[in-house]
Amino acid sequence: MKNILLAVEDSPASLAAAQLAVRLVSEWAGRLRAVHVLVDGALEAVLEREASSGGVHGRRARGANAVLEFVADLADHAGVPVETTLVAGEPARSILAEAHGWPAELIVLGGAGRGLDGEPYMGSAVSRVLEFADVPVLVVPPGGRPSQDAQTHG
């Protein structure tokens, strides 16, 4: 596997996934593409209207770009080539479209960690990517290494 698509957001599990993806690409002499999905939705429109300072979308985009810059810095320090992209849409659908269109040979993403009851929790986007991906998917827990909580599908 040489083409790894990393779906990244600002969460401990996602940042751990970024570190693992960079390491895998380095070991496999592959290519890395990092994608962050800005969720389109009605909530953002309401927040934009209600926020006195405005610019909710702009702040979210700046935060997303900061996450992508973090991944680019990780890759640069490891000598790994990386492409970063920011897309808007529904997360699972956008991740799958990026994986298909690139084409990725492996999708790496962070798991959601633990729910309120302390049990492992996997968000709906991760579940949908696992269900509909046509390439292997590696879900990384917040600790950074695949473990009993990590799930591989494919």
Language model features with spans:
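Acidic, proline/glycine-rich short linear motifs
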Residues: 36-66, 146-154
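Short, hinge-like loop/turn segments at secondary-structure boundaries
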Residues: 49-53, 101-103, 125-126
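Short secondary-structure boundary segments
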Residues: 36-37, 110-112, 141-142
